[in-house]
């Protein structure tokens, strides 16, 4: 194989109480796409932070273009030709697209005047490469989250880097945007650029990558070519064990109807009716923009309803706020755990008990002993990997953050649990643990709504499935009668069906 343009060898990094990297290695080759795989907490992000100078390494070596290097920070590595596209956007909504792309390195004349026309022209060229249909003069805040992600990618391309690291680049992208990104990756590959591609989406790995490096518990497990492995082999490398069944659906005794929605209309939702039983998992499928999240937020009280009826255990309720929804026994775990679900600057304990303070209080005093007992019980039950309940949640891996978000909802002892994209950005090992928790709630008789963009997840975990299209229910199936073709037909509004 060609000599690596970038080689990280035997990297070690320790934090108080944890060894994040233990002889981790990564090779990046010119003109090839290297997938960096591993469960959340495997050390992928830490390794990238060591590379770009955010963290200093305790041991090991980094060679770039055959020379040993040690970068002082992201700016230093970027100027050397190594760019990283983070999962969390590093952009300013109040500035234009062009201003964001060239922030801190504006094009100027010899007299210091900013060359706006030249900047806009260059930015427009970058946007065209990514098939973004906006002028470079557009304010970033006017773009969708997926379009903002494409601007972040355009910013990295503007450095004409020799190595580009993409951390979950398609997480917020539509299928069309993903296709545009893959076209650019192929273009960069042909130009000899080395690319590190970090993703939990195995389908993407086998579609766009050439090589794979796997980390587990901070250790280098192996490097192989994509053509020499398969999904089962890759999963086994990542988790250290075989996953015999990805979706461990269980049979459980279903009870009476707990939730009945009749003719519900609200923000992005039109005349929706359905029922949900105790001990049932109701999957909700559909394409981006179909109204799935809007429907859940109307039921929960985060978005207003215009008309319709919501009955909970035979009693009509009308949640007008999230607090109202919680008080009525409805818990909603947001698809955006970092935006809506968690406060990243607070501890695990503070996040977990945030919505249950009424239950944990006597008068105006929080019963701290009861709070600690409840939080510790959930940490143990959910196998949350954290040094302590006082750990700042922003320091946890994505999978452990998601477990805390779910525990936060369960602390309120809900009758109905709504899980919106519960495994988004979560590795395969943590997914399995979350599925097992969902099954446990189901076995205990809880009513669960599972909203997911991953059709295999909906098919594998649900007892019954609703499909949404343009704010309406376009199909309903028993899981045993559904398949991806039927769900997709309903999702695009081509074949409305009601098989349940």
Swiss-Prot record:
Class of enzymatic activity (EC top level): translocase
UniProt-listed InterPro entries: AAA+_ATPase, ABC_carbohydrate_import_ATPase, ABC_transporter-like_ATP-bd, ABC_transporter-like_CS, P-loop_NTPase
Membrane topology: Peripheral membrane protein
First-listed, main subcellular location of the protein, grouped into a coarse class: membrane
Catalyzed reaction equations: D-ribose(out) + ATP + H2O = D-ribose(in) + ADP + phosphate + H(+)
CDD domains, per the entry: ABC_Carb_Monos_I (cd03216), ABC_Carb_Monos_II (cd03215)
Domain of life of the organism encoding this protein: Bacteria
Record-listed ATP binding positions: 38-45
Pfam families for the chain: ABC_tran
Subunit structure comment from the entry: The complex is composed of an ATP-binding protein (RbsA), two transmembrane proteins (RbsC) and a solute-binding protein (RbsB).
NCBIfam families: PRK10762.1
Record-given protein name: Ribose import ATP-binding protein RbsA
Organism, scientific name: Vibrio cholerae serotype O1 (strain ATCC 39315 / El Tor Inaba N16961)
């Amino acid at each position: 194989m060609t000599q690596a343009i970038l080689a990280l060898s035997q990297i070690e990094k320790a934090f108080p109480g944890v060894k994040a990297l233990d002889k981790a290695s990564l090779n990046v080759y010119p003109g090839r796409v290297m997938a960096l795989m591993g469960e959340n907490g495997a050390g992928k992000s830490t390794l990238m932070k060591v590379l770009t100078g955010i963290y200093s390494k305790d041991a090991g070596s980094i060679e770039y273009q055959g020379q040993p290097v040690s970068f002082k920070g992201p700016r230093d590595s970027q100027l050397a030709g190594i760019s990283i596209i983070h999962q969390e956007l590093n952009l300013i909504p109040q500035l234009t697209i062009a201003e964001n792309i060239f922030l801190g390195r504006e094009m100027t004349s010899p007299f210091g005047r900013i060359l706006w026309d030249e900047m806009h022209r260059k930015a427009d060229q970058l946007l065209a490469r990514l098939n973004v249909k906006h002028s470079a003069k557009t304010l970033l805040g006017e773009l969708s989250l997926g379009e903002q992600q494409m601007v972040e990618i355009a910013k990295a391309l503007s450095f004409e880097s020799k190595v580009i690291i993409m951390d979950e680049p398609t997480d917020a992208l539509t299928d069309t945007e993903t296709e545009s990104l893959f076209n650019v990756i192929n273009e960069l590959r042909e130009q000899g650029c080395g690319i590190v591609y970090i993703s939990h989406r195995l389908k993407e790995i086998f579609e766009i990558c050439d090589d794979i490096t796997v980390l587990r518990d901070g250790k280098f497990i192996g490097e192989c070519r994509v053509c020499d492995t398969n999904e089962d082999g890759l999963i086994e490398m990542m988790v250290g064990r075989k996953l015999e069944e990805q979706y461990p659906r269980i049979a459980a005794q279903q009870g009476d109807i707990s939730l009945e929605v009749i003719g519900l209309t609200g923000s992005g939702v039109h005349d929706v009716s359905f029922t949900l039983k105790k001990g049932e998992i109701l999957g909700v499928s559909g394409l981006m923009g179909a109204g799935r999240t809007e429907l859940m937020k109307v039921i929960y009280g985060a978005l207003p309803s215009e008309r319709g009826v919501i009955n909970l255990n035979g009693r009509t309720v009308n949640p007008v706020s999230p607090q109202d929804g919680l008080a009525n026994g409805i818990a909603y775990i947001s698809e955006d755990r970092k935006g809506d679900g968690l406060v990243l600057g607070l501890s695990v304990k503070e996040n977990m008990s945030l919505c249950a303070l009424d239950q944990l209080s006597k008068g105006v005093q929080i019963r701290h002993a009861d709070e600690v007992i409840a939080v510790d019980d959930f940490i143990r039950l959910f196998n949350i990997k954290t040094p302590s309940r006082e750990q700042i949640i922003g320091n946890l891996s994505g999978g452990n953050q998601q477990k805390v978000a779910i525990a936060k909802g369960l602390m309120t002892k809900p009758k109905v649990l709504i899980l919106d994209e519960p495994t988004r950005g979560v590795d395969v090992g943590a997914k399995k643990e979350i599925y097992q928790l969902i099954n446990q709630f189901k076995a205990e008789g809880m009513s669960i709504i599972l909203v997911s963009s991953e059709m295999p997840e909906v098919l594998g975990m649900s007892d019954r499935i609703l499909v949404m299209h343009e704010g309406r229910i376009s199909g309903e199936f028993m899981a045993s009668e559904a398949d991806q073709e039927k769900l997709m037909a309903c999702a695009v509004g081509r074949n409305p069906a009601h098989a349940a």
